[in-house]
Regions:
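Nucleotidyltransferase catalytic core that binds NTPs
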Residues: 2-243, 256, 279, 286
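A C-terminal functional module that forms or caps the active site or interfaces directly
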Residues: 238, 250-288
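Active-site-adjacent helical/loop segments in soluble small-molecule enzymes
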Residues: 243-251
Length: 288
């Protein structure tokens, strides 16, 4: 039976040295879980927190908008930041520890992003269109893992490619952390919860529902069409929408994230979409 460590108030740290020292003092015989975020928290993040509570004594959340994973400076600048609101949410939800660092606490001046071999997991989709993105993600995740040394780390399946890459590098780097993926939290319309949704207009939110509708169509019709036929039908759905720009639509193997020509067994396939709604870039996927 797990009981979240009782503290009078959530502890907040801005320096990794102080965070490590505090964790070293409380972690004996305790399960420490970690949830990395870039802030602008929503119910999707909170579902990770809720799941972590079921098997943890200490929960560490981080809020850090990692500059090295943005290959578009304007995207970094526009990324929504709601730090005070986020702190209040985490306090209310009884997060144990918040790590809220500045860039200088995690990166040295002029530090080069580490280059990883992802064994082809980054060849398509996000890796193809956002060069260097996953090296930036893996760099910061490795840093955070080594600072916090959790037993478990929780990630949303909405960022499926990121999740699979983090699982892979954790094994390659021999970091003994259980990586746990949590199903995507959705609005009633099916739209995947995302911090970027805050940048959408009401009309944009309505148009964005096409993404999940298309993914669901692919899943429900995988017994009726070939992969190529389904891709063609699905892509056609986007051609009739104004202000909706389909960046990619791929049907891939869940394990390797490589495009497939024939469907695999149940729960070994994934359909993945990236699309911009009036310049707001959204991603989503469905596993089937």
């Amino acid at each position: 039976m797990f009981a979240i460590l009782l503290i009078s108030q959530m502890k907040t740290f801005t320096l990794k040295s102080e965070l490590k020292s505090y964790l070293n003092g409380i972690r004996k015989d305790k399960i420490v879980s970690f949830i990395p975020t870039m802030g602008s928290l929503h119910e999707g993040h909170l579902s990770l927190l809720q799941k972590a509570k079921e098997s943890s004594d200490v929960i560490v959340c981080s809020i850090f908008v990692n500059p090295t994973q943005f290959n578009n400076p304007s995207d970094l600048e526009k990324y929504p930041r709601t730090t005070e609101i986020d702190i209040n949410i985490l306090t209310e939800k009884k997060c144990t520890i918040l790590y809220l660092p500045e860039v200088s606490d995690l990166y040295q001046e002029n530090e080069q992003v580490k280059q990883f071999d992802f064994d082809g997991l980054d060849n398509f989709m996000e890796g193809e269109g956002r060069k260097g993105h996953f090296n930036g993600v893996a760099t910061i995740v490795e840093k955070l893992f080594r600072i916090i040394s959790p037993e478990k780390a929780f990630f949303g399946e909405k960022d499926l490619q990121q999740l699979q890459i983090i699982k892979y590098i954790s094994k390659q780097l021999q970091i003994p952390i259980e990586i746990i993926g949590i199903p995507t939290k959705r609005e009633e319309s099916g739209l995947a919860m995302s911090s970027r949704n805050k940048l959408l207009s009401e009309t944009g939110i309505q148009k964005a529902t096409l993404i999940y509708q298309t993914l669901k169509y692919i899943k429900e019709n995988s017994d009726n069409f070939t992969v190529d036929q389904l891709k063609k039908i699905a892509i056609e759905k986007f051609s009739h929408q104004t202000d909706v720009n389909l960046e990619y639509l791929e049907i891939v193997s869940l394990e390797k994230l490589q495009p497939i020509s024939e469907f695999k067994d149940a729960n070994e396939n994934a359909a993945c979409i990236a699309a911009s709604i009036s310049s707001v870039r959204l991603i989503d996927n469905i596993i089937f």
